[in-house]
Design a protein with these regions (language model features):
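C-terminal catalytic domains of large/alpha subunits in multi-subunit enzymes
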Residues: 1-103, 109-111, 115-223
C-alpha cells in the first residue's frame, strides 16, 4: 500500500516502524469495515485471504511459508481470545502485520480488549495480545522485551501522544504537555513467540504497528 498521499502532505521523520505505522492502521481498519459490510467475522475474513498463494507464497530463505505463517499466528490468537467475557461497552479488535516484502520479515497478529466510556469518550485498554512468528528465536528474553516495548509504544502512539501543528510549528514542545503512556495506563499483556525452525528475522519494529488498528477495531465493536 503506497503512502503517496502522506508524502505529498508532509515529510515524516524517523519513528520506530517508520511508514508502516500509519499504513497498517488504515489498511487493517479498512479490512474490518469491509468485513462488517460483508457480514463476516473480521478474523475469519482475514484468514480466508491468507492462503499463501501467488505473491503471498514467500521465498527462501527469509520468508518461507509466506502468508500461511501469518494465518497461523492469527489462528493461535483467535483461540487465545475465544473465551474472553466482554462487559458492557467493551470490545476486542484484531489486526495482522507482516514484512514479507522486506529482507527481514516477521508475521504478527495483535488483539486489544478495550472499554469505552460513552459519556466521556475515554478509551481504556484492558489487555493486549500478540502472537509472533519470527523464525528461530535466538534470544527469547530479548525477543520478549522487543515485543513488550513494541506493544507499549504502539499503545502510547495510539491513545496518548498527540501534537497539533499551529502557525507552522508543533504546539507541544516539552513533556509537561506532550504526554506519553504512563505506568498506570499499562494493560495486561499476553505475548507468544511461535516455535519455528525457519530463518530468524527481526522483531525490533513490527510489533508497534498492529496496536493502533487493533484498538480502533475494538472501539468499533464496543460502541
Amino acid at each position: 500500500v503506497n503512502n503517496k498521499v502522506a508524502q505529498d502532505t508532509f515529510t515524516p521523520g524517523w519513528l520506530r516502524s517508520v511508514g508502516q505505522g500509519w499504513i497498517v492502521w488504515g489498511l487493517e481498519s479498512f479490512i474490518d469495515e469491509v468485513a462488517v459490510k460483508a457480514n463476516k467475522d473480521p478474523v475469519d475474513f482475514r484468514l480466508a485471504m491468507l492462503d499463501g498463494k501467488g505473491k503471498q507464497g514467500g521465498k527462501a530463505p527469509e520468508s518461507v511459508g509466506g502468508a500461511t505463517r501469518l494465518a497461523n499466528t492469527l489462528e493461535i490468537l483467535k483461540k487465545k481470545t475465544a473465551n474472553v467475557k466482554l462487559g458492557a461497552d467493551e470490545g476486542i479488535g484484531y489486526s495482522v502485520s507482516a514484512g514479507q516484502e522486506r529482507t527481514m520479515p516477521a508475521w504478527l497478529a495483535t488483539a486489544a480488549h478495550v472499554h469505552v466510556n460513552k459519556r466521556t469518550g475515554k478509551i481504556t485498554v484492558k489487555k493486549l495480545w500478540v502472537v509472533s512468528d519470527a523464525g528461530i528465536v535466538i534470544h527469547p528474553d530479548g525477543a520478549m522485551a522487543q515485543l513488550e516495548g513494541s506493544l507499549l509504544w504502539g499503545l502510547s502512539l495510539a491513545l496518548f501522544e498527540h501534537n497539533e501543528v499551529k502557525n507552522g510549528q508543533v504546539s507541544k514542545t516539552n513533556l509537561h504537555t506532550y504526554l506519553p503512556l504512563r505506568m498506570n495506563d499499562v494493560p495486561e499483556m499476553d505475548i507468544e513467540l511461535v516455535e519455528s525452525e525457519e530463518f530468524p528475522v527481526g522483531l525490533g519494529e513490527p510489533g508497534v504497528i498492529g496496536v493502533a488498528p487493533a484498538i480502533g477495531n475494538a472501539v468499533y465493536q464496543a460502541i
